[in-house]
Amino acid sequence: MIGIDIIKISRMGALLERFGSKAMGRFLSKDEIELVKNHKTASGFWAAKEACSKALGVGIGAECGFHDITIFKSSNGAPNIRLSQKIVKEFNVKSISLSITHDGEYAIAVVTIESTAANKI
C-alpha cells in the first residue's frame, strides 16, 4: 500500500510558535524532537506519519496513533520509519519505506508498506 501527505510548512510554523514543544510532543517522541531542527523538519515528520497511517488504510486515530510511528535517521542522515510492534502485528507489516521531500512552502512524504495476507490492508 502507498500513502502520501503534504503540509504547508508555515502551518506547522504557526502551530509551533503558538504552542512550542508541547505541540511537538503531541505527535513526536523525545528522540524525534531532538532531530527536529526547524519548522521544515517538523513538517516533514508530520507528513511522514500521516502518509504512513494512510498507507495502513486507517489514518491517524484509534487504530494507529502518532506515537505508533517513529521517524529516525540512518547513519547517512536519510529518514527512516519504524512501527510499534502492535501495528506490525495487527497489519502484518513485512517492510516499510519512507521518502520525505521539501519544495518551497511544502513538505511531502510518501510511505510504502508491504504486508503479508494482512488483516487490515
Curated annotation (Swiss-Prot):
Enzyme class: transferase
Domain of life: Bacteria
Cofactor(s) the record lists: Mg(2+)
Sites where the protein binds Mg(2+): 5, 50
One MF annotation (Gene Ontology) recorded for this entry: magnesium ion binding
Chief place of localization: cytoplasm
EC number(s) from the headed UniProt entry: 2.7.8.7
Keywords assigned by UniProt, alphabetized: Cytoplasm, Fatty acid biosynthesis, Fatty acid metabolism, Lipid biosynthesis, Lipid metabolism, Magnesium, Metal-binding, Transferase
Pfam families xrefs: ACPS
Subcellular location: Cytoplasm
Segments passing through the bilayer: none
GO CC term (a single one): cytoplasm
One of the GO biological process terms: fatty acid biosynthetic process
Catalysed reactions, semicolon-separated: apo-[ACP] + CoA = holo-[ACP] + adenosine 3',5'-bisphosphate + H(+)
Cited function: Transfers the 4'-phosphopantetheine moiety from coenzyme A to a Ser of acyl-carrier-protein.
Family according to the record: Belongs to the P-Pant transferase superfamily. AcpS family.
Identification of the protein by name: Holo-[acyl-carrier-protein] synthase
Organism of derivation: Sulfurimonas denitrificans (strain ATCC 33889 / DSM 1251) (Thiomicrospira denitrificans (strain ATCC 33889 / DSM 1251))
Gene it is expressed from: acpS
